């Protein structure tokens, strides 16, 4: 359920919630190549919001971790000791295939998105004694809405 909700959240961040409010898409300076300068420009474009979370496609996460700026001795020591990778400009980085290849989604987690739920988590059980079958269904009704459109942006390496 949590993976499906995360995928829905990424979709709403990228495409909007049906109110003509998709995230602004910015392109890197050189198509197909992400640079530290691109990350700084992306971070700088969030004023008055704070870029505190990024959702990176697996290829972009690897590109960020392979940047010389992300491979200094202290960052490497922390990564090897704790397993926590250094993050771009202090933002919490989530690697997910829910983001399209070549895409980095940046957001202010306090202002970009809200989860709207109808009821809670519902668990139902069913038993057929004569056939020795037992099954369970777990459902949740939820959706996402954007709070402030400018609190999320997309950086793409595509031309």
Feature roles, as predicted:
Residues 68-159:
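Sequence/fold signature of self-assembling virion shell proteins
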